[in-house]
A protein has these predicted regions:
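Active-site helix-to-loop segments that bind/position phosphate- or nucleotide-bearing substrates
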Residues: 1-7
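Internal, well-folded beta-alpha domain core
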Residues: 7-182
Length: 182
C-alpha cells in the first residue's frame, strides 16, 4: 500500500492532506501518521505474541476510542484500506459504521458463461494505495458521504458501492477488469 501511495512523491498539498487525514494502523505501534519515523520491522496484526496474545485483540481497546472519535466527526467518511487481520483490531460500532467504507478488490475476467469475479488478495494492497493516492491528489472538495467517496474513486477506477445496511460498514468494491488487470 505504501509503495503505491508514494507518499514522498506527492505534491506538498497532498502530503499535508495525508498528514491531516490518513491514519496507519501498525501491529507494532498502534496508530501512526503516514510520515511518522519508525524503525524497519515485520510484525503482522495476525501474530499471537507470547505474554501478549493475538495482536488484534491487544490493540482493540487502544484503537477503538481514537478511531471511533474520527469516524464520528460530522461529515466524516473513513476509507478503510485495512486487510482482514488489521480490520479485526477495530470494528466500527453500529453508531459509526455508516461513515466507514471498507475497500475490497476484485479481478473480473470474461468467460464464455459471462464475467467471473475473484477476490484479489496479493495485489489488493497496491490497488488500495493507488486509490488513496488518487483521493489525496484530487483538488476537489473532500468526499463527505460514502456516495461522494465512490464518485471520487470512480474518476480513476471501476467501483461499485454496496448498498447501505443500518449499523454495518459499507463496502466499496474496486473491480479490475481483464486478465492482466492489476
Amino acid at each position: 500500500l505504501y509503495e503505491a501511495l508514494g507518499l514522498g512523491t506527492l505534491p506538498r498539498a497532498a502530503r499535508a492532506r495525508a498528514a491531516e487525514r490518513v491514519l496507519v494502523v501498525s501491529a507494532a505501534y498502534g496508530v501512526l501518521a503516514p510520515d511518522d519515523a519508525v524503525p524497519a520491522h515485520r510484525l503482522s496484526m495476525g501474530t499471537d505474541l507470547p505474554g501478549v496474545g493475538p495482536l488484534a485483540a491487544h490493540w482493540r481497546p487502544h484503537l477503538s476510542p481514537l478511531l471511533e472519535a474520527r469516524a464520528a466527526e460530522p461529515g466524516q467518511v473513513v476509507l478503510d484500506c485495512r486487510s482482514a487481520a488489521y480490520a479485526a483490531a477495530w470494528r466500527p460500532s453500529r453508531a459509526t459504521a455508516g461513515s466507514v467504507v471498507a475497500v475490497r478488490v476484485f479481478r473480473e475476467r470474461a468467460t464464455p458463461d459471462g464475467p467471473v469475479r475473484t477476490v484479489v488478495s496479493h495485489d489488493a494492497k497496491r490497488t488500495r494505495g493507488e486509490l488513496a493516492r488518487h483521493l489525496l491528489l484530487r483538488r476537489r472538495r473532500e468526499p463527505d458521504s460514502p456516495e461522494a467517496l465512490a464518485a471520487a474513486a470512480a474518476e480513476a477506477f471501476a467501483v461499485e458501492l454496496q448498498p447501505a445496511v443500518p449499523g454495518r460498514v459499507r463496502h466499496l468494491d474496486v473491480v479490475l477488469r481483464g486478465e492482466g488487470a492489476a
